[in-house]
Amino acid sequence: MLILGIDSSGHTASVALYADDVVLSEYSCNIGLTHSQTLLPMVAEIFSRTGHTVDELDAIAVSAGPGSFTGLRIGAATAKGLALGYDIPLLEVSTLEGLAMNVRDMDAVYVHPIMDARRSQVYTATFLDGQLIGEEEAIGIEELVANINQMPGKHFFLGDAVPVYRSCLEAQLSVPYRFAGPGNLLQRASSVAMLGAEQLALGKAVSGKDFHLSYIRKPQAEREREAAGLREYDITHEDPNLLKKAAGEDRLAARNYKIDAGPGYEDDTVPENL
Protein backbone atom coordinates (compact mmCIF):
# COMPACT_ATOMS: atom_id res chain seq x y z
CA MET A 1 0.00 0.00 0.00
CA LEU A 2 1.64 3.22 -1.19
CA ILE A 3 0.19 6.53 0.00
CA LEU A 4 1.20 10.12 -0.64
CA GLY A 5 0.49 12.44 2.29
CA ILE A 6 0.02 16.19 1.84
CA ASP A 7 -0.45 18.89 4.48
CA SER A 8 -0.54 22.60 3.70
CA SER A 9 -3.00 23.68 6.39
CA GLY A 10 -0.56 26.00 8.16
CA HIS A 11 2.72 27.80 7.57
CA THR A 12 4.55 24.51 6.99
CA ALA A 13 4.16 22.64 3.73
CA SER A 14 4.74 18.91 4.16
CA VAL A 15 4.66 15.87 1.88
CA ALA A 16 5.43 12.25 2.68
CA LEU A 17 5.46 8.87 0.99
CA TYR A 18 4.28 5.99 3.16
CA ALA A 19 4.25 2.27 2.36
CA ASP A 20 3.40 -0.75 4.50
CA ASP A 21 4.04 0.84 7.91
CA VAL A 22 7.21 2.60 6.75
CA VAL A 23 7.68 6.32 6.10
CA LEU A 24 9.83 6.14 2.96
CA SER A 25 10.46 9.87 2.76
CA GLU A 26 9.13 13.10 4.22
CA TYR A 27 9.82 16.72 3.34
CA SER A 28 8.68 19.76 5.29
CA CYS A 29 9.28 23.39 4.39
CA ASN A 30 8.66 26.47 6.54
CA ILE A 31 10.86 29.19 5.07
CA GLY A 32 8.37 31.91 4.16
CA LEU A 33 7.60 30.77 0.61
CA THR A 34 4.01 30.22 -0.49
CA HIS A 35 2.75 26.66 -0.67
CA SER A 36 2.22 27.07 -4.40
CA GLN A 37 5.98 27.60 -4.69
CA THR A 38 6.99 24.61 -2.59
CA LEU A 39 4.35 21.88 -2.64
CA LEU A 40 4.58 20.51 -6.18
CA PRO A 41 8.39 20.64 -6.31
CA MET A 42 8.45 18.69 -3.03
CA VAL A 43 6.05 16.09 -4.45
CA ALA A 44 8.20 15.72 -7.56
CA GLU A 45 11.35 15.42 -5.46
CA ILE A 46 9.90 12.76 -3.19
CA PHE A 47 9.08 10.54 -6.16
CA SER A 48 12.48 11.18 -7.69
CA ARG A 49 14.36 10.30 -4.50
CA THR A 50 12.37 7.16 -3.69
CA GLY A 51 12.20 5.80 -7.22
CA HIS A 52 8.42 5.47 -7.09
CA THR A 53 5.99 6.92 -9.63
CA VAL A 54 2.55 8.47 -9.36
CA ASP A 55 0.84 5.52 -11.03
CA GLU A 56 1.99 3.26 -8.17
CA LEU A 57 -0.04 5.21 -5.61
CA ASP A 58 -2.96 3.47 -3.94
CA ALA A 59 -4.27 6.77 -2.58
CA ILE A 60 -3.45 10.37 -1.71
CA ALA A 61 -4.16 11.51 1.85
CA VAL A 62 -4.57 15.26 2.29
CA SER A 63 -5.23 17.47 5.27
CA ALA A 64 -8.80 18.70 4.80
CA GLY A 65 -9.01 21.26 7.59
CA PRO A 66 -9.29 23.16 9.77
CA GLY A 67 -6.51 25.55 8.93
CA SER A 68 -5.51 28.36 6.62
CA PHE A 69 -8.20 28.80 3.98
CA THR A 70 -5.61 29.58 1.30
CA GLY A 71 -3.24 26.83 2.39
CA LEU A 72 -5.97 24.21 2.42
CA ARG A 73 -7.07 25.22 -1.07
CA ILE A 74 -3.54 24.85 -2.44
CA GLY A 75 -3.20 21.39 -0.91
CA ALA A 76 -6.60 20.40 -2.26
CA ALA A 77 -5.73 21.68 -5.73
CA THR A 78 -2.51 19.69 -5.71
CA ALA A 79 -4.18 16.49 -4.51
CA LYS A 80 -7.17 16.85 -6.83
CA GLY A 81 -4.95 17.54 -9.81
CA LEU A 82 -3.05 14.30 -9.25
CA ALA A 83 -6.15 12.31 -8.33
CA LEU A 84 -8.18 13.37 -11.35
CA GLY A 85 -5.24 13.10 -13.72
CA TYR A 86 -4.23 9.60 -12.71
CA ASP A 87 -7.48 8.21 -11.30
CA ILE A 88 -6.20 7.96 -7.73
CA PRO A 89 -8.60 7.93 -4.75
CA LEU A 90 -8.36 10.65 -2.10
CA LEU A 91 -8.53 10.41 1.68
CA GLU A 92 -9.78 13.35 3.77
CA VAL A 93 -7.80 13.70 7.01
CA SER A 94 -8.61 16.14 9.80
CA THR A 95 -5.74 18.54 10.43
CA LEU A 96 -6.27 18.23 14.18
CA GLU A 97 -6.30 14.45 14.05
CA GLY A 98 -3.12 14.58 11.99
CA LEU A 99 -1.44 16.69 14.68
CA ALA A 100 -2.59 14.30 17.40
CA MET A 101 -1.16 11.43 15.34
CA ASN A 102 2.30 12.94 15.87
CA VAL A 103 2.11 11.72 19.48
CA ARG A 104 -0.43 8.90 19.31
CA ASP A 105 1.82 6.60 21.36
CA MET A 106 1.25 8.68 24.49
CA ASP A 107 -0.93 6.67 26.89
CA ALA A 108 -3.38 8.09 29.44
CA VAL A 109 -2.61 11.67 28.42
CA TYR A 110 -5.09 14.17 27.03
CA VAL A 111 -3.66 15.48 23.76
CA HIS A 112 -4.78 18.95 22.67
CA PRO A 113 -3.74 20.06 19.18
CA ILE A 114 -4.26 23.83 19.05
CA MET A 115 -4.03 25.89 15.88
CA ASP A 116 -4.06 29.67 15.86
CA ALA A 117 -7.45 30.83 14.54
CA ARG A 118 -6.69 34.47 15.41
CA ARG A 119 -9.07 36.80 17.24
CA SER A 120 -7.91 35.11 20.48
CA GLN A 121 -9.31 31.79 19.30
CA VAL A 122 -7.85 28.40 18.47
CA TYR A 123 -8.99 25.44 16.42
CA THR A 124 -8.79 22.49 18.76
CA ALA A 125 -9.97 19.05 19.77
CA THR A 126 -9.12 16.62 22.55
CA PHE A 127 -7.75 13.13 22.01
CA LEU A 128 -7.17 10.34 24.53
CA ASP A 129 -5.30 7.19 23.51
CA GLY A 130 -5.72 8.20 19.88
CA GLN A 131 -9.50 8.65 20.09
CA LEU A 132 -11.35 11.93 19.59
CA ILE A 133 -13.27 13.12 22.65
CA GLY A 134 -16.09 15.51 21.85
CA GLU A 135 -15.90 17.60 18.69
CA GLU A 136 -13.50 19.81 16.80
CA GLU A 137 -14.20 23.46 17.52
CA ALA A 138 -13.06 27.06 17.36
CA ILE A 139 -12.90 28.38 20.91
CA GLY A 140 -11.44 31.29 22.86
CA ILE A 141 -8.15 30.43 24.52
CA GLU A 142 -9.34 31.41 28.00
CA GLU A 143 -12.49 29.32 27.65
CA LEU A 144 -10.36 26.39 26.51
CA VAL A 145 -8.11 26.72 29.55
CA ALA A 146 -11.13 26.83 31.86
CA ASN A 147 -12.50 23.65 30.28
CA ILE A 148 -9.18 21.82 30.56
CA ASN A 149 -8.81 22.79 34.21
CA GLN A 150 -11.97 20.76 34.83
CA MET A 151 -10.33 17.62 33.38
CA PRO A 152 -8.15 15.85 35.99
CA GLY A 153 -5.14 14.13 34.47
CA LYS A 154 -2.09 14.88 32.35
CA HIS A 155 -2.36 17.16 29.32
CA PHE A 156 -0.18 17.67 26.25
CA PHE A 157 -0.29 20.58 23.79
CA LEU A 158 1.00 20.85 20.24
CA GLY A 159 0.29 22.97 17.19
CA ASP A 160 1.19 26.44 15.94
CA ALA A 161 -0.88 28.13 18.66
CA VAL A 162 1.48 26.84 21.37
CA PRO A 163 4.09 29.59 20.91
CA VAL A 164 1.30 32.16 20.49
CA TYR A 165 -0.49 31.31 23.73
CA ARG A 166 2.19 29.55 25.75
CA SER A 167 2.46 32.28 28.36
CA CYS A 168 -1.33 32.29 28.81
CA LEU A 169 -1.41 28.52 29.21
CA GLU A 170 1.47 28.55 31.69
CA ALA A 171 -0.20 31.26 33.75
CA GLN A 172 -3.70 29.80 33.87
CA LEU A 173 -3.47 25.99 33.72
CA SER A 174 -3.93 24.23 37.05
CA VAL A 175 -3.50 20.66 35.74
CA PRO A 176 -0.24 18.86 34.85
CA TYR A 177 0.80 19.72 31.29
CA ARG A 178 3.61 19.59 28.76
CA PHE A 179 4.30 21.17 25.37
CA ALA A 180 5.56 19.42 22.25
CA GLY A 181 9.12 19.97 21.12
CA PRO A 182 10.04 21.25 17.64
CA GLY A 183 9.95 17.78 16.06
CA ASN A 184 6.29 17.13 16.84
CA LEU A 185 4.92 20.64 17.26
CA LEU A 186 3.59 21.23 13.73
CA GLN A 187 1.74 19.34 11.02
CA ARG A 188 3.51 16.38 9.42
CA ALA A 189 2.48 14.74 6.17
CA SER A 190 3.66 11.37 7.46
CA SER A 191 0.94 11.51 10.12
CA VAL A 192 -1.61 12.42 7.45
CA ALA A 193 -0.45 9.48 5.32
CA MET A 194 -0.65 7.02 8.21
CA LEU A 195 -4.18 8.11 9.07
CA GLY A 196 -5.01 7.88 5.39
CA ALA A 197 -3.82 4.28 5.33
CA GLU A 198 -6.21 3.49 8.17
CA GLN A 199 -9.07 5.16 6.30
CA LEU A 200 -8.24 3.32 3.08
CA ALA A 201 -8.40 0.00 4.91
CA LEU A 202 -11.88 0.97 6.11
CA GLY A 203 -13.04 1.87 2.60
CA LYS A 204 -13.29 5.61 3.26
CA ALA A 205 -11.60 6.85 0.08
CA VAL A 206 -13.39 9.33 -2.19
CA SER A 207 -12.84 10.42 -5.78
CA GLY A 208 -11.22 13.70 -6.70
CA LYS A 209 -14.62 15.06 -7.71
CA ASP A 210 -16.17 14.13 -4.35
CA PHE A 211 -13.39 15.48 -2.13
CA HIS A 212 -14.29 18.56 -0.12
CA LEU A 213 -12.51 20.62 2.50
CA SER A 214 -14.09 21.16 5.91
CA TYR A 215 -13.78 24.39 7.87
CA ILE A 216 -14.61 25.02 11.50
CA ARG A 217 -14.98 28.72 10.82
CA LYS A 218 -16.18 30.35 7.66
CA PRO A 219 -13.62 32.07 5.41
CA GLN A 220 -12.80 35.69 6.27
CA ALA A 221 -14.84 37.14 3.42
CA GLU A 222 -17.95 35.31 4.58
CA ARG A 223 -17.37 36.22 8.22
CA GLU A 224 -17.20 39.88 7.33
CA ARG A 225 -20.57 39.64 5.63
CA GLU A 226 -22.31 38.11 8.62
CA ALA A 227 -23.14 39.63 11.97
CA ALA A 228 -23.15 36.38 13.99
CA GLY A 229 -20.37 35.76 16.52
CA LEU A 230 -17.57 33.36 15.72
CA ARG A 231 -18.71 30.79 18.27
CA GLU A 232 -22.01 30.37 16.49
CA TYR A 233 -20.39 28.94 13.37
CA ASP A 234 -20.76 25.24 12.85
CA ILE A 235 -18.35 23.19 10.79
CA THR A 236 -19.01 24.11 7.18
CA HIS A 237 -18.14 22.23 4.03
CA GLU A 238 -16.37 23.69 1.05
CA ASP A 239 -18.47 24.94 -1.83
CA PRO A 240 -17.25 22.90 -4.83
CA ASN A 241 -17.36 26.07 -6.93
CA LEU A 242 -14.83 27.87 -4.74
CA LEU A 243 -11.85 26.14 -6.32
CA LYS A 244 -13.14 27.02 -9.78
CA LYS A 245 -13.42 30.67 -8.80
CA ALA A 246 -10.09 30.86 -6.99
CA ALA A 247 -7.62 32.97 -8.92
CA GLY A 248 -3.86 32.97 -9.37
CA GLU A 249 -1.57 30.71 -7.43
CA ASP A 250 -4.22 28.95 -5.31
CA ARG A 251 -5.96 27.37 -8.27
CA LEU A 252 -2.82 26.87 -10.36
CA ALA A 253 -0.81 25.12 -7.65
CA ALA A 254 -1.03 21.69 -9.26
CA ARG A 255 -0.67 22.74 -12.88
CA ASN A 256 2.06 21.87 -15.32
CA TYR A 257 4.75 20.61 -12.95
CA LYS A 258 6.74 17.64 -14.21
CA ILE A 259 6.21 14.52 -12.10
CA ASP A 260 7.18 11.00 -13.12
CA ALA A 261 3.86 9.32 -13.78
CA GLY A 262 5.29 5.92 -14.58
CA PRO A 263 5.09 3.84 -17.74
CA GLY A 264 2.08 4.19 -19.98
CA TYR A 265 1.62 7.94 -19.56
CA GLU A 266 2.68 10.01 -22.55
CA ASP A 267 2.16 13.33 -20.79
CA ASP A 268 3.45 13.38 -17.24
CA THR A 269 2.26 16.87 -16.35
CA VAL A 270 -0.51 17.40 -13.88
CA PRO A 271 -3.68 18.13 -15.89
CA GLU A 272 -5.32 21.55 -15.80
CA ASN A 273 -8.87 20.37 -15.10
CA LEU A 274 -8.79 21.03 -11.37
Regions found by a protein language model. Give the residues of each.
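DPxDG-like acidic metal-binding loop motif
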Residues: S63-L90, T95
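Surface "functional belts" at beta-alpha junctions
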Residues: V22, T34, P89-Q187, Y215, ...
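Gly/Ser/Thr-rich beta-alpha loop segments that engage phosphate groups in nucleotides
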Residues: T12, T34, G65-F69, R73, ...
